[in-house]
Amino acid sequence: MTKVLVINTKYKNFGGEDANILEEVGILSEYFEVKYLEFTNSSNLKFFDYISFFTNNNRNSNKTLKKVLDDFSPDIAYIHNTWFRAGLGIYKILNEKNIKILFKLHNFRLDCTKSYISKNHISKKNFCLKCGYISNSSFSFNKYFNDSYFKSLIAIRFSRKLLKSISKFPMTILALNNFQKEFIKSYKKD
């Protein structure tokens, strides 16, 4: 039987993606041997979590993933959300182990956080239809999170590196709509 490892970083507040993933795990379990690996974004940050903000590679998460891979030996890794606790190092590990990667694109965060300057995020009307972001200056910093420049900077760096990972490593992208499909095609080389 094909083994599927579902990987997700749970949001602090339970939301649509988290509910969707649990539902999918149930459905997948009817046809495959499934293991669910969940990372949690909590307020209780450890030393390596702070480092991972800058490297986008979480040492503890990588260690956890390697142990699960050794114990479970999946054929497929089905990735939902890696922001930020899972980190981007998991793509390299999965690629090195020759595990097929499926990446589900749930929302438009990648598009909204792909640039440092707000003019590359918003339309000519200074408004983003995808996330509701409003900017009065097209040359201002792309403050994706209204309450934090730092969190916005970290999100932008993460998204830019995730887009590089999508381009670098072989994976199948599961998009929710044609807009996302076309958006991600511009980054995918294969």
Q: Which residues make up each language-model segment?
A:
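N-terminal subdomain of nucleotide-sugar transferases
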Residues: 1-42, 70-72, 93-100, 172
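Short aromatic-enriched loop/helix-cap "lid" or pocket-rim segments at secondary-structure transitions
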Residues: 18-19, 46-50, 90-91, 113-118, ...
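Short amphipathic alpha-helical segments and helix-helix/interface helices
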Residues: 25, 66-69, 88-95, 160-167
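A short, charged, and often flexible helix/loop element on the N-terminal side
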Residues: 39-66, 78-81, 142-155
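Membrane-proximal helix-turn-helix segments that form the acceptor-binding/catalytic region
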Residues: 63, 109, 120-172
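An aromatic- and histidine-rich active-site surface loop
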Residues: 78-99, 103-137
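Helix-loop-beta element that forms the nucleotide-linked donor phosphate-binding surface
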Residues: 164-169, 181-190
